[in-house]
Amino acid sequence: MNVSLISVSPDAEKHMAYCARVSNPNNQDNENYAGLLRYCIKHQHWSIFEQAFMTLEINTTRGLAAQILRHRSFTFQEFSQRYADTNLLDTNIPIPDLRRQDIKNRQNSIDDIPEKQTKFLQERIRQYFNEGMDLYNELLREGIAKECARFVLPLATPTRIYMSGSVRSWVHYIDLRSGHGTQKEHMDIANACKSIFTEQFPTVSEALQWV
């Protein structure tokens, strides 16, 4: 998993404050905007936070990408397994961590699998992934279209997403997906997004008590 910044609105916090003062044009160029942004967050005037945007590159797996793509307030561009050879991203499929299913909460897992069992099962997974990747490559060599060959690949296959959204969307996504109830691997992505967000939007992050 890796998350990196691609682009962000120039002077984003200043720009949002400028737009927030649309009804007070004589004060729009006021450089003191921290208090205004804090006020807007405190009183949930969220529309102003739709005026600035950020795009991140997220390198993850197909399984996690399916969860991320459900956040429809964002716009996405994803690596196409139909157009491109998946080996362009990585020739190996990463072995996932293994956790026990929580029988009381089906959306939760518990990290208490014995090490010996974990190693045994991860080796089985490694063999399975290698066989799947070998078959995928064989299909390509035989002239089978990528759009057909991709169906033998597991959900752990690497993918790349460009995720673009407003500050408001990022606040909602990070708040939701960095909290309990989110799959650990997705939580790690959300926290990586949060780290970049706090660097790019320090005033907003402080008002949200993220720093």
Where are these regions (language model features)?
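Family-specific signature for flavin-dependent thymidylate synthase
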Residues: 1-211
